[in-house]
């Protein structure tokens, strides 16, 4: 194993100093980015390429990670019917909790009413400010989304880094390998061997995470300023608190029912959470999350199917945001929505949140798609939250990430593909600390 000499050296030197852990470095980088962006905003905005470059580095390796994990996982299945079962159970879980997240956002908006009393005239809003997002939303459709899952070419799917297209091909290729049996054994062995250097490459790329988080946070604070939060603090606070309650109460209850602690899980994936906080991109944590879930005892085939699919279909944070933001706009502009209007909003959001998945700025675009179908709420009202959306995107991404981690463990347990002893050891901190960085290796 490549990591053996490194582990031996680490063991001989005793416990690592705290500052050598990735999560500490990312946390310091985020704090430094906030300070620099606040006191030197012009310099902060110029550091955007650092964050963009890191995201591109991670996206570069996502397709190989998904392909190797899914193809080898399915190829090793003795019962191919399991593939359909895992996918079906995952989609059932996604639909249930995505809908629940939408309903919770709707209820909270009605109870708290964060937009009440603003009395903004809809005619005074500038539709040009959100025209780009509205145009992108109109380009999306459910049929277009589903047909786009099928890649035009295999190379094109990998070149574009489209998660669902890569997943689609990987599943088919894994099934084909399983069906040819011994004839495909050499290919499976080769792919298994290729997994080690690919995950080592992920570990190398993760060392740049503090730089990416620093640049992204400096840009955000430098461009939008901490002061821009104050005017709409009620909406931001309501969204953050609702998301926290969803994670600790709803997902916490799911975790407890399935035999693990949500707090222990959050501690286990802390590096990935801080990475998302710094970059505002849940994709940045995808390779590390897949590796962590496999190390936690979830079968590779389950991890490979649930997490990439969940990145498009299990967006709990985005769903809470959509109904909450839609009702905020209605309240701010003095538009009364009947329960019938709100149910229509809920049904449209259930569809549009899937149809616009995987797009940059997906949360804002899916909101535009939803409002364009619901005539009661003006799409131009999105201009009210355009300036603060960037501050809510981190919370959306964090909630989405936790939701997918929980979903993976739950589906693995439903399929009897979860090593509970390994899960307990991982969540108890017995698998080593910095597994998303220097210690990252594919689980056996």
UniProtKB/Swiss-Prot annotation:
Its main location: membrane. This is C4-dicarboxylate transport protein. The chain crosses the membrane at residues 18-40, 53-75, 90-112, 142-159, 163-180, 201-222, 232-254, 327-349, 364-386. The gene is dctA. It is found in: Cell inner membrane. Belongs to the dicarboxylate/amino acid:cation symporter (DAACS) (TC 2.A.23) family. It is a multi-pass membrane protein. Keywords: Cell inner membrane, Cell membrane, Membrane, Symport, Transmembrane, Transmembrane helix, Transport. One of its GO terms (biological process) is L-aspartate transmembrane transport. PROSITE patterns: NA_DICARBOXYL_SYMP_1 (PS00713), NA_DICARBOXYL_SYMP_2 (PS00714). Responsible for the transport of dicarboxylates such as succinate, fumarate, and malate from the periplasm across the inner membrane. This transport system plays an important role in the energy supply of rhizobium-legume symbionts. Pfam families: SDF. It comes from Rhizobium leguminosarum. GO terms for cellular component: plasma membrane. The lineage of its organism: Bacteria, Pseudomonadati, Pseudomonadota, Alphaproteobacteria, Hyphomicrobiales. GO terms for molecular function: fumarate transmembrane transporter activity; malate:proton symporter activity; succinate transmembrane transporter activity.
């Amino acid at each position: 194993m490549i990591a053996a000499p490194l582990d031996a050296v680490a063991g001989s030197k005793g416990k690592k100093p705290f500052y050598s852990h990735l999560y500490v470095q990312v946390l310091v980088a985020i704090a430094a980015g906030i300070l620099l962006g606040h006191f030197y905003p012009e310099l902060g905005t110029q550091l955007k390429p650092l964050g963009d470059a890191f995201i591109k580095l991670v996206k570069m390796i996502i397709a190989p990670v998904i392909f190797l994990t899914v193809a080898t996982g399915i190829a090793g299945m003795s019962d191919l019917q399991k593939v359909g079962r895992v996918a079906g159970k995952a989609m059932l879980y996604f639909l249930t909790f995505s809908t629940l997240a939408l309903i919770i956002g709707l209820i909270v908006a009605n109870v708290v009413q964060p937009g009440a009393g603003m009395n903004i005239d809809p005619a005074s809003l500038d539709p040009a400010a959100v025209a780009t997002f509205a145009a992108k939303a109109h380009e999306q459709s459910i049929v277009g989304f589903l047909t786009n899952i099928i890649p035009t070419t295999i190379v094109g799917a990998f070149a574009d880094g489209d998660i669902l297209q890569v997943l689609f091909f990987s599943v088919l290729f894994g099934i084909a390998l399983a069906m040819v049996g011994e004839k495909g054994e050499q290919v499976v062995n080769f792919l298994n061997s290729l997994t080690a250097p690919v995950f080592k490459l992920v570990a190398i790329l993760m060392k740049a995470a503090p730089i990416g988080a620093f640049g992204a946070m400096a840009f955000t604070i430098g461009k939008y300023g901490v002061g821009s939060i104050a005017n709409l603090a009620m909406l931001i606070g309501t969204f953050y608190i609702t998301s926290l309650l969803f994670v600790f109460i709803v997902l916490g209850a799911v975790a407890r029912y399935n035999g693990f602690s949500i707090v222990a899980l959050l501690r286990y994936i802390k590096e990935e959470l801080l990475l998302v906080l710094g970059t505002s991109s849940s994709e940045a944590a995808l390779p590390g999350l897949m590796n962590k879930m496999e190390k936690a005892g979830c079968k590779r085939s389950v991890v490979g199917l649930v997490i990439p699919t969940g990145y498009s279909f299990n967006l709990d944070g985005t769903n809470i945001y959509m109904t909450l933001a839609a009702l905020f706009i209605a309240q701010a502009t003095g538009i009364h929505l009947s329960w019938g209007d709100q149910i229509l909003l809920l049904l449209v959001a259930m569809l549009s949140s899937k149809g616009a998945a995987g797009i940059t700025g997906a949360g804002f675009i899916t909101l535009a798609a939803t409002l364009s179908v619901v005539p009661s709420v003006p799409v131009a009202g999105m201009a009210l939250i355009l300036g603060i959306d960037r501050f809510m995107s981190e919370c959306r991404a964090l909630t989405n990430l936790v939701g997918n981690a929980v979903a993976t463990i739950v589906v693995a347990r439903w399929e009897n593909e979860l090593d509970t002893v390994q899960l307990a050891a991982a969540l108890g901190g017995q698998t080593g600390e910095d597994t998303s960085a220097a210690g990252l290796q594919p689980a056996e």
